[in-house]
Amino acid sequence: MKLAKHWIAAGALLLASGWSALAQTISSPKGGLQLHFALTNEGVPTYRLSFANGEEIIRQSRLGLEMTDGKKSFDKDLEVTATKESTFDETWTPVWGEVKQIRNHYNELLVELKKKSNGDPIAIRFRLFDDGLGFRYEFPGGKDRNFYVVKRELSEFAMTGDHKAHWIPGDYDTEEYDYQHSRLSEIRGLFDKAFTENCSQKAFSKTGVQTPLMLKTDKGVYINLHEAALIDFP
């Protein structure tokens, strides 16, 4: 089957506690950020991101995918089969944009896992830049591998506080809304006023918002959550 990739990027990130012994940590190229990966005792994959001084931006958060066939879900009961660290550094010239050249420099952690019950493999690839983190899920190919239908993604971004959010309502049809500015805890109460439903729009959650989502902490740290490279993804 084709390699299924799902990148989620967050600019300026972090997390904490409850880790099993199978923990991996990598630092960004200049050492300012640290990415921590671990399995819980139940075999649930988790990650957290912090500054080098230990200050958290994103707390310990779960990872995983729920499949339509629950027995094939990668949500728990996983074990690490291999890990690989690498570094990449290149500079490329965009065809159009605000800058002439862009440096693509990151340290990478590839975590290969398998389901204990049936041996099905999955990999999670992390790329840690000096200004943010990206990660994606990968399904190793091969004629003997099963096909999967993803029902729900379980990736979490556990914030450290009730940050200020700059958001618009989330739906699958349009982005034609006025931006709202509120605390995360206030989104539910403001959602109905911010959302205007018509024949081309339908909300999926009273707290669902569009990406990219820009957040600002009380300490002045900006966090941007976005997604890209949605290949063979529902």
PLM feature spans:
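N-terminal secretory signal peptides that target proteins for export/translocation
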Residues: 1-4
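Bacterial N-terminal signal peptides
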Residues: 9-18
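Sec/Tat signal peptide C-region and signal peptidase I cleavage site
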Residues: 19-23
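N-terminal accessory beta-strand-rich subdomains and adjacent acidic, glycine-rich linkers
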Residues: 25-234
